[in-house]
Each structure stands twice: as C-alpha cells, then as structure tokens.
C-alpha cells in the first residue's frame, strides 16, 4: 500500500465530546467519524483493523467447527412475540413498521431468527450438534451512547448459536466456544480474564464474560491473584467473613444517635468499627388484591446490596424498593433508623451470611435519632433467613478457597451463554431423538463485540503519542518513512526495494510516499500506532544502514540495508507468534 493512494485522516485535536482515551485516539487517528449519537463511519484505517479482528475470529470459529451464515438485520415482530422478548425487551429494541404496517425490529441479537432456522431445518438428532455463526451489524438504542465504539448504538458483532440434543452435549459445545474465545483474545494480544457472569436479558443457566482489563472498564471484576478464579462482582459468591457466631458479650441497649442516619456516622459517634453496624434495606413484593409483602434485608455497614442475587431468592422475584410511605407504615419511622426489632407490622427478615454470624451488633431502633446496640440473634430477635445478598469486596476470601479476592475494572468484549431450552420451548424448536420422541433443542449462544475490541485494545495500549497496537490488529504492520522520497533517487530506490521485499514476505506494509516532512510522517504513524517503522535517508544509505524503531521502543537502532526487510519481517512474525 502506498500512502499517496490511501486515505489518512489524522487530526491534531480530539472532539470535545470524547471522554476516554480510545474514543479520542480513534477519532484523531482517522479510524472513525461520528454520523449520529452512537453511530460511526469506519474510515479506511479503522476498517483495516476491524477486518483483522474479523479474520482472527473467523479462523478460530471455523477451527472450533462453527458454520458461517448470514441472517437479516431486519426481523419480523412475530418471532420476537413468539419468544416473549417483544414484551420483555425495553426501549433498546428499535421497532418500526413497513409501508404495509407490518411490525419489525432491527436486531440487537439473533436468537429468534436462528431458532426459526433450526426448527425448520433440523429434524433429527443426527443433524446435531451444529453451531451457526455470523459477523454482522447490530443495533441497540442505548439511552446514552458514549465512549465512541465502547457504547455505541450500531456495532459489528460476531454471534454464534449452538444446537444440541441434550445438556451434556451443550456443555461440550460451550467448552469449544469458551476455548475458541481464549484463543481469539490471546491471538489479538489482549490482557483479559474470563469471568463467571449473570445471564441478564438473554436468559439461560450458565455464562462467562470475557473482559479486557482496563481502568476505564464499566464492569467490576472480582478475581483471585493466586488462582484462576474470576467473576463479575454481580455474580461472585460472597462467603461469610465470620466462621461462626460468638456468644453475646453485651446487653442490648437503646442509644441516642441524633441526626446520625448513616452507618458511618453511627459508628463514628459510638466509637465502634463500621463493621459492627447493620445496614437495613427495605424491599417490597406486590400481591394482587392485597397489601405488599415487606422485606428487611440486613447487611454489614460496609457492604453493598447485590440486587441480582437478591432477585433470585424465593419470593423476591420482581421486587422493588419500598416507598417511604410503606416504610413508615411498617416500621413507624422514615429511612435512616430502621431495624428488625419493634416493627409496626410483620416483615420478612433476610440476613446476609456475614450478618448471620455477627454478635453484639448495632441496628436502627425504628425511632428517629435512636439505634439499638448489643443486639444478638436468638436472644434479642429470631433467627433470620440467611442468604448471599451482597457484593464481594477486595480482601474477601476467594470462593475457590485459594486466596483473597482483588477487584479490577474490565471491558466486556465477549460473552458465552448456556441457554438451555428457553427459546426452543417458546418457539417450538424440536427434533426427533433416538427413541423417536420429539425433544426441544438445547441451545447456547456466543457473542463477541468486533468493534468494541478495537476500543478495548486501545484502552490497554496507548502512550502520549497515540495508539500502540497489538501486532495482530494493527492497520499496518510496518511503515516505511523515506526522507525525500520525491527528491532522492537513492532513497526512492531503497524504499521501493524494501517495500517489495516486505510485501513479498507477506508483511502488511505501507510506504509513506506523500512527501511530508519527517515530523509530520512520524507523528501520523505514531498516532495511528503502526508497530514497526523503518526510516530511509541518504546519510544512512551511504553507510549501508536503515533506521528501525518499534512503536514500543524508546530508541531507534540501525539495521544493515541489505537485510533490513528480512530482520523486520522476522520481528513481525515473532510478535504474531507470541
């Protein structure tokens, strides 16, 4: 590729609305341009990196036995109504009508369409397992698109869907996809972690997210530095921090706490550790034709409620936070001084595992400006329902028993789900088993955010000059920067020879023949992030040398001109092999 025949749209300044590094650098490097909120043009530099990500994904999907197809972006509403997601999906689902008033959606995912394919094409267990995948543009109408490609509305995604005869076979398909994802992100050159996750709106029984580790990540990940354990904070099991409950050592007493409605303020006033206070959270579940059931959830003062775990407890599906009027009616006091002792009306008490093992703790007195200290289970109030209802914290014991947890931030770039029969049951996707009986197909689904990978990779790989691409997805592997290409025959001949040798060796090389000043050339390619640069100048050629500098190198080195192409080609191959 010659730069004079390519489009290089670099900018000195980032747009004012760009908040994170990847957004700023993708615009400045000429990779993307905004069309509308969360919708972008992918310019030639950006598209080259996208195609490289797609190529790696496609190779590994094919290697894992998946079969590529292509489904329509526009999907009929009837399929979504069959699955039940027409009503379940929120405003993120873009719905519209055609000229005949038929309703359609722009697909955010393709479970419905692929299930329709399977129910019409797969009739026997002999046709399974099968795994279909596509690489295609999706649309989700995000309420607040931001961060460039990291949270866009339109994006490119690889989505795959497996169909198996039973759950054991699904586990095998799932493992193949999990392993393929590990290979994909390793080949791309990302620092990542697979983490146990919640299934969210997709549904199903088991899933893992693949997160690129970055300080700007939207998700908190709990991991154990001394083992392989990692899970999204919303899914990580929180073990009890006390092995057993100590015997009571204090008498229960009412304590004045004027104006102290927060656990931190109560602990400071009483001169006790925050860990001895109890945070009370009031939820409600509605009952048709009757008053709601009120729940009091008890957490240690320094812990936070995990609503996803809470929603899975018996009786708490569809819960909501109680209104202030309900709180006053059941507890006799507004929020800030609530507790399980002396409620006005019966409430259901759920204690977190750690709280269940606490002794001599402090709770609200259900009276403004008062708390109760020295409270103990059994002696002062009934034994509670015990459940894991909190988020883990750094320092908590790892659920695998192999150390303590730490917390980092991650950017989700892939997700694998064991769907089970959620969609096949709803849409009647059945097959005939070995005994001649109709059975629902057992499904898995597997997504990778192609365009999101670019943003995530940049968040891990940048410096004050620009992007520092992992070798495998750089728009070009090598750039040739000739000093005076349009003025010096020797420079031009040497540059053209290097270009031909590198291209013949299969290296993705670009020759900057634009005639720009050295400072402009260097700044452009450092901003774009090409991993290897060769500078060809008359002075160096007189000594038989060409200047080489890797994008991550602090200093340039000199290479023999007659072997420079081979040396750089070997550097590229070595980097790709890592």
Swiss-Prot record:
Would I find Protein biosynthesis among this entry's keywords?
yes
Question: What does the UniProt keyword field contain?
Answer: Aminoacyl-tRNA synthetase, ATP-binding, Cytoplasm, Ligase, Nucleotide-binding, Protein biosynthesis
Q: Name one GO molecular function term.
A: ATP binding
In short, the EC number is 6.1.1.15
What range does the record give for the signal peptide? none
Note whether tRNA processing occurs among the keywords.
Answer: no
Where does this chain mainly localize? cytoplasm
Q: Which Pfam families match?
A: HGTP_anticodon, tRNA-synt_2b, tRNA_edit
Q: Which reaction does it catalyse?
A: tRNA(Pro) + L-proline + ATP = L-prolyl-tRNA(Pro) + AMP + diphosphate
**Disulfide-linked positions:** none
Q: Which CDD domains match?
A: ProRS-INS (cd04334), ProRS_anticodon_short (cd00861), ProRS_core_prok (cd00779)
Domains: entry comment: Consists of three domains: the N-terminal catalytic domain, the editing domain and the C-terminal anticodon-binding domain.
Give the protein's biological function.
Answer: Catalyzes the attachment of proline to tRNA(Pro) in a two-step reaction: proline is first activated by ATP to form Pro-AMP and then transferred to the acceptor end of tRNA(Pro). As ProRS can inadvertently accommodate and process non-cognate amino acids such as alanine and cysteine, to avoid such errors it has two additional distinct editing activities against alanine. One activity is designated as 'pretransfer' editing and involves the tRNA(Pro)-independent hydrolysis of activated Ala-AMP.
What protein family does this chain belong to? Belongs to the class-II aminoacyl-tRNA synthetase family. ProS type 1 subfamily.
Its name, as the record gives it, is: Proline--tRNA ligase
**Its encoding gene is what?**
proS
